[in-house]
Design a protein with these regions (language model features):
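A short glycine/small-residue-enriched secondary-structure motif
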Residues: 44-54, 61-69, 87-98, 104-113
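Structural motif
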Residues: 58-67, 178-181, 318-327
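Helix-centered, glycine/charged polyanion-binding patches within enzymatic domains
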Residues: 224, 230-321, 325
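Basic, short loop/linker segments at the boundary and entry of helix-turn-helix/winged-helix-like folds
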Residues: 27-79
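Short, well-ordered loop/turn and helix-capping segments at boundaries between secondary-structure elements
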Residues: 92, 123, 224, 304, ...
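Short helix-capping/linker segments at secondary-structure and domain boundaries
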Residues: 79-84, 198, 309-315, 335-347
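Charged, often Cys/His-bearing segments associated with DNA-binding zinc-finger transcription factors
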Residues: 1-47, 342-346, 350
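Polybasic low-complexity intrinsically disordered regions
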Residues: 67, 78, 84, 88-91, ...
């Protein structure tokens, strides 16, 4: 069995709790990331890794405890640090060492150890399993019913420079256009429950592939109301969507901006009672579109956490698989955060 961490720290770590309280009052971003990594998500990943992780090293460098490596990996992903940056962070910050169960008297975790554990996560597809586990926990808690969902995609930028050894860009990335702006990189397509924000479906693809082509990979067939933006117009007629065994599904797709301009111009050209009736009709449609957007906006919060709070607006590695594995881990952490908010008792207001 794996040895347990007894919690005993060195004299250099005695003041860690005091420093932690001071930094928490000053809104330290890294301390906030540690506070979000609760024991439940750490234990879930430990249980997934335990049957596959080596327990004892017969020769060579002594093995690193599984709990320590899980904490280091999740903290590294949450802070969007490279392997070398994470090694330096553990060496210089006693609060991080205390969180990761690493004492100053022990050997520091090297960047190669962090690298190998990340490859271990990618090889066994543990990030996908962690996301599926969070979805099942949310379904048990009643936070994810798959009835009212929203789907969308977002760009993850990649380096467009060719000043490297191969004199070429990443062959798995591509260029895509949005709002007259070109982006080089990949896209993360997700589907989430509109009520709780729990993400249950993800697909990674190059940036030049349209969002509508991956909608069939996100839906399960249990959905009853699907909220989409104007880029998904006509999705119900596609062959891959018709093959999904929906029981009774309704599509709520946003109207194109050009339709709004046309209706406004027509209503402005008419006067009298007819013009007033057209204006009222346009206002009713505006309210309907606003209602659909208010439901669809729940999926935008996941992109806010992915790209701004977790800082994953640019890819870390070459290729889709490694970057998608990192995004899956972040989506699983976001699901745990949303599930805690869902299960928390409502705050009383005076």
């Amino acid at each position: 069995m794996e040895e347990l961490f007894n919690g005993q720290l060195s004299f250099a770590d005695i003041e860690a709790e005091q420093f932690l309280q001071i930094r928490r009052t000053h809104a330290d971003r890294r301390v906030n990331a540690m506070d979000r990594l609760t024991d439940d998500v750490i234990n879930e990943l430990i249980q997934l890794c335990l049957p596959l992780y080596h327990i004892k090293a017969n020769h060579g460098r002594p093995y690193t405890r599984l709990e320590t490596m899980v904490r280091v990996h999740l903290l590294q992903v949450s802070l969007n640090l490279s392997d070398l940056e994470m090694e330096s962070y553990l060496a210089s910050d006693m609060v991080a060492r205390s969180f990761c169960r690493v004492s100053s008297t022990h050997q520091f975790i090297s960047d190669s150890t962090i690298l190998r554990f990340r490859h271990f996560i990618e090889q066994h597809r543990l990030a996908q399993k962690l996301l599926e586990r969070t979805v099942s926990l949310a379904a048990e808690a009643g936070a994810c019913s798959f009835e009212m969902v929203a789907a969308d995609g977002t760009f993850i930028e990649a380096p467009s420079s060719t000043k490297n050894k191969a004199h070429a860009r990443d062959p798995e990335m591509a260029s895509g256009k949005k709002a007259n702006t070109w982006h080089f990189g990949m896209k993360e397509h997700i589907a989430a429950c509109s009520e709780s924000g729990i993400i249950y479906g993800t697909v990674a693809a190059p940036a030049n592939e349209h969002d509508i082509t991956h909608l069939g990979d996100l839906l399960k067939g249990l959905e009853k109301m699907v909220f989409l933006d104007s880029g998904y117009i006509g999705c119900a007629k596609r062959a891959e969507i018709q093959e999904i065994p929906f029981k009774d599904v309704s599509w709520y797709i946003a109207a194109k901006p050009s339709a709004w301009k046309k209706e406004l111009s027509i209503s402005e050209n008419f006067g009298g009672e007819l013009g007033q009736a057209l204006v009222e009709c346009v206002n009713v449609k505006r309210q309907l579109e606003h209602a659909k957007a208010s439901v669809r906006c729940s999926i935008e919060w996941s992109f806010l956490w992915l790209k701004r709070i977790y800082g994953y607006a640019k890819v870390r590695y070459r290729g889709l698989a490694k970057n998608h594995s990192r995004a899956l881990t972040l989506f699983a952490l976001y699901n745990c955060y949303r599930l805690r908010k869902w299960c928390a008792p409502p705050e009383l207001s005076c």
